[in-house]
């Protein structure tokens, strides 16, 4: 049962950030498993069970990231990730192809939200066409989100794609879509109540998740 992370877990992630090498990590691997990996998996499993029970038709799965970076993509960085996360999403072949609910823990923050890791141009074209042809469903979602703790984090195009009004312009002109809430690694992070907070957030975000996930069923939009 998830009991919260600990200050030692945050300190461990700082340790990886400044000592990202096998010589530092390997003698401390058991610490990593106890302090970071185990509570991350407990939190993810309990949140997944709750969301999957409420949305049984969605065929969701839980994915907890591994600490090891892809050796083909180190680009001069160390072999270990200094921030870890899990996602709740439907099964897929390409990780950028579907939206997800996520929780992330880093040395200097924790975060949770919903969106794409890296939405494809085709997916974003489908979203823009939805906004053009039937904006009301997304307008309803965005109005509620604008009153919540979550903020849109998608990077905008340097040259806007168009003007669809103040409410949806940030969504229409984004290269990628994600909304999230960031907090300092303290307080509720170190308590069992973190699960309740994140679960409430996930429930609040499910209308957005379902909307984004439904884009996969739209026909390809015309090239712009």
Q: Predicted regions span which residues?
A:
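Short histidine-centered catalytic/ligand-binding loop motif
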Residues: 29-36, 116, 126-131, 190-194
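Active-site acidic/histidine clusters and adjacent loop/turn architecture
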Residues: 14-67
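Long, hydrophobic, amphipathic alpha-helical segments used as structural scaffolds
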Residues: 47, 51, 55, 142, ...
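Long, solvent-exposed, polar/charged low-complexity segments
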Residues: 1-15, 44, 131-132, 136, ...
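Sequence-level motif detector for i,i+2 pairs with an aromatic at +2
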Residues: 62, 81, 109, 174-176
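Aromatic- and glycine-enriched beta-alpha-beta binding-site module
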Residues: 72-132
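Compact, glycine/acidic-enriched structural inserts
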Residues: 106-164
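A short, surface-exposed loop/turn module that caps and links secondary-structure elements
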Residues: 53-80, 84, 149-162
């Amino acid at each position: 049962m998830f009991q919260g992370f600990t200050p030692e877990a945050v300190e461990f992630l700082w340790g990886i950030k400044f000592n990202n090498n096998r010589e530092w990590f390997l003698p401390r691997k058991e610490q990593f498993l106890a302090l970071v990996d185990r509570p991350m998996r407990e939190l993810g499993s309990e949140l997944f069970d709750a969301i999957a029970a409420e949305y049984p038709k969605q065929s969701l799965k839980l994915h907890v990231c591994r600490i090891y970076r892809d050796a083909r993509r180190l680009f001069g960085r160390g072999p270990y990730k200094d921030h870890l996360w899990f996602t709740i999403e439907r099964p897929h072949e390409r990780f950028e192809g579907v939206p997800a609910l996520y929780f992330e823990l880093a040395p200097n923050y924790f975060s949770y939200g919903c969106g794409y890791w890296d939405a494809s141009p085709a997916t974003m074209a489908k979203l823009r066409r939805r906004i053009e042809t039937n904006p009301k469903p997304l307008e309803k979602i965005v109005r509620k989100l604008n009153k919540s703790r979550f903020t849109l984090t998608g990077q905008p195009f340097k040259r806007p794609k168009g003007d669809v009004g103040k409410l949806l312009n940030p969504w229409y002109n984004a290269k990628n879509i994600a909304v999230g809430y960031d907090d300092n690694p303290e307080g509720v992070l170190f308590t069992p109540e973190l699960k309740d907070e994140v679960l409430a957030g996930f429930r609040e975000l499910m209308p957005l998740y379902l909307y984004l996930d439904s884009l996969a069923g739209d026909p390809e939009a015309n090239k712009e």
